[in-house]
């Protein structure tokens, strides 16, 4: 199983390579994008299969589609916004020279200067131009614009292409810090003679004739602030929607969450884990407006709290339904286009029953259900969840090790994983092993020793899930080879002993 997003879907050759090298199931995370993007992803997979047939490379199987419901994921609410300098980083080689130009746009109709991430477009930023909008039409391909960035460093921008009357594609070869009011000048006008002695030059300091010969940078898009905390700090979680704010002399830092009703289930000394356990805290006090936490980890360094990061309450019985109204709406699309649906945060057998009832309402009683076990309650109720799953025509389990490790403790993950595998084998239910399988390989191109051993254990499951990354094809190749090798001497949890050198073909010529 491989997680596929819209970026991968728009790379036909990449999809073909994933299919050829062993991708049997494509996973779509419904927490991202919309039905429009999901349909593009599914159509791209089917088109890739057709192309392989036409090339005589038919893989002999149809890739299944699993779509994960978002579920009731508890996240940090929004933070206060602030305009800070925008850093555009250029990658350098060992000699300090730019490996390649970083591309962006000058846009006289853009409201903000900001980073962008457009699928299939290499450009990574937009510089909004706030004056003399028609001046962009006078720029020539190959022309250079000069400026002093927010640090006072002299920088050059190269004109690469005219997109239209208001957008110019540009390139930079040195790291650049941008802020509102910076002046871009055509190189031939000798910027050095006009540069004001400090780097705070802005539009108000220039005469009207000078402004006519220059491009003035528009405002930077405000970004969410980040809160820094360390062991011993206090942090408030508000029960109302209040934007996250830093600490002051008189009050601690504060945040909100997207599901404030769960805060009524929290008790004194319960743990609250932030951002996949990177920050640990305990509840010190509770009132009608907020709960007060004391940060207990990290002990020596500071950690950053960002908006939209996860919140976990491993000691609290939150009693929240596993299916949201948004999930029910998404089901209408899923049953028509996918093979199975993944139910996030399965805590109780009643969650399975609720989802199955929705599938019956939609006329798809035989549709596949995959229960994702990723919470403390999910583990405690696993036996009843499995028995309920046996009453559903098509049912399986996914071991979601990310939240599961945070909720149950990293030191317990291995034992819990083993218990889930054994129980599922006993009741003859298929298992998907997920989260951080060959993640370093998929992202960097080189695996760690530990994750190779971890991936090989995936033979114990019916399927192994990989997340996306630059080297995802390499990860699929290696995982496929590992699982086929392990298959020779393992049947589920039973080991079959064979001659070592024959098993691994060490001395084959």
Could you tell me what each predicted segment is?
Residues 1-509:
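Non-catalytic helical/linker scaffolds that mediate oligomerization, partner binding
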